[in-house]
From Swiss-Prot:
Organism expressing this protein natively: Aspergillus niger (strain ATCC MYA-4892 / CBS 513.88 / FGSC A1513)
Signal peptide positions on this chain: 1-19
Protein name (database record): Aspartic protease-like protein pynH
Domain Peptidase A1: 43-410
Listed Pfam families: Asp
Lineage: Eukaryota, Fungi, Dikarya, Ascomycota, Pezizomycotina
Entry function: Aspartic protease-like protein; part of the gene cluster that mediates the biosynthesis of pyranonigrins, a family of antioxidative compounds. The first step of pyranonigrins biosynthesis is performed by the hybrid PKS-NRPS synthetase that condenses 6 malonyl-CoA units to an acetyl starter unit, to form a 1,3,5-trioxotetradecane-6,8-dienyl-ACP. The enoyl reductase (ER) domain of pynA is likely to be functional during the first two rounds of polyketide chain extension, to generate the saturated C-C bonds of the alkyl side chain.
Length: 414
């Protein structure tokens, strides 16, 4: 999506990106918590779109560049919906919204093939505007109105759209801007920061009002910050589009950091650096709390070292702890005491962030007292890239600043 001739400008403050403030926005100077339910795809929440508002389940996705919603359109025909979709699919019916305006003539038709929504089938969308309603806010938002061009009648998706929270770079038009960013630029949100809490077990769910997580829009809760927040400038690299999330045209809007150190306990592991779009060398930490963010990020070599430490043996699991392409191993759970924490450092600070063994080891539910690693690898050999998601965030507060283009991390105070 982004010609290399202007890559140098991508990390100019996001406030300079093209976003036309609109008078069709309510002003709200507090934050709002999206209540998250964990699913096999990622975290889901209900959001209302249109006038009157149609409340639908959305996948909250740190790695998507806009507000995507399934509509009635099938091969451009709003009356042929179920020629493309399952009859149980929950959809946004744009024909019932008095504020829906199709703006495809202005922005152009959106089309990604391949993509990480439907993989080998194309993701196609018209561009439109409508009122997005979250809490007391209502913002006239540019959205991606899905226009299906393949048959997906076999089953319904458990959500109706994607609430994208990717960073916005200079030159990104509104069709690929996070709806939160559009709302902040329109004055609906006082703060450009969004934050995430993962309430991963029954002991922590009270913090999330009984839900599995909170995605806070417009700030963070200072009472849950233990110590200081460490802020890191993000980097831009096309390597993510090659090794991790493959789109054509390429998508490079990620909350990604330069990973400067990865160690297993005190054993430092080799880094395999790639070239970023400003010419620097970096191993990459990409933040993603959907299904691709499950599992502690490790290198292939690091995974081999963990296997050696506990004498693990290869195993085929019917219900693996994550959907990574790496193999899985089992070992005697008593050997978990031999495992050290995994440690990561990012450019801008020498602070090491840990994933302790109890958060990357899982007991197999087969009554054999066997355990497996919940880890995920990308690439070959040394550490080139890792996805930092819910496994990393179990005991941390993760924040994104849309104005400064920074990732903030703090220990979480329960």
């Amino acid at each position: 999506m982004f010609p290399c001739s202007r890559i140098w400008s991508l990390l100019v403050a996001a406030a300079t990106a093209s976003a036309v403030p609109t008078s069709l926005a309510t002003t709200h100077l507090q934050s709002v918590d999206l209540l998250l339910t964990r699913s096999s795809y990622g975290f889901l929440t209900d959001i209302a779109l249109g006038t009157p508002g149609q409340s639908l389940p959305y996948l909250v996705d740190w790695t998507w560049t806009g507000h995507y919603v399934v509509t009635t359109l099938c091969y451009n025909d709003p009356t042929a919906t179920y020629d493309c979709l399952n009859v149980d699919q929950k959809i946004f019916n744009q024909t019932l919204s008095s504020t829906f305006i199709n703006q495809t003539d202005q922005y152009g038709y959106l089309y990604w093939d391949p993509n990480h929504f439907y993989f080998t089938e194309p993701a196609a969308a018209d561009v439109a505007t409508d009122m997005l309603r979250i809490g007391p806010t209502a913002v006239n938002t540019t959205i991606q109105a899905a226009n299906f061009v393949f048959n997906e009648t076999i089953s319904a998706f458990p959500f109706s759209g994607v609430y994208g929270l990717s960073p916005v770079f200079q030159g990104d038009n509104r069709s690929v801007q996070a709806s939160f960013y559009q709302g902040w630029r329109s004055g609906a949100w006082h703060s450009p920061i969004v934050s995430f809490i993962y309430c991963h077990d029954n002991a922590t769910k009270a913090v999330c009002s009984g839900y599995d997580g909170l995605q806070t829009l417009g700030g963070y809760n200072t009472s849950h910050v233990q110590g200081d927040i460490t802020w890191y400038d993000i980097i831009v690299t096309e390597a993510i589009n090659t090794l991790d999330f493959v789109y054509a045209p390429a998508v490079i809007n990620y909350w990604a950091l330069n990973l400067t150190r990865f160690s297993i306990g005190d054993e430092e592991q080799e880094l395999n650096k790639t070239t970023t779009l400003d010419g620097k060398q970096a191993a990459v930490a990409a933040f993603d709390h959907a299904s691709y963010g499950r599992g502690a990020p490790v290198s292939v070599y690091g995974y081999q070292r963990l296997v050696e430490l506990v004498g693990a043996k290869a195993v085929t699991l019917s219900d693996p702890p994550n959907n990574g392409e790496q193999g899985f191993y089992q070992f005697d759970c008593r050997n978990s005491s031999l495992l050290p924490p995994l440690r990561y450092e990012f450019a801008g600070s020498e602070r090491a962030w840990e994933i302790v063994p109890e958060n990357y080891v899982e007991v197999l539910a087969n009554g054999t007292n066997k355990c497996t690693f919940n880890v995920r690898t990308l690439g070959d050999g040394a550490m080139v890239m890792g996805n930092f998601g819910e496994t990393f965030a179990i005991d941390k507060y993760v924040m994104f600043d849309f104005e400064k283009l920074q990732v903030g991390i703090a220990d979480f105070a329960w």
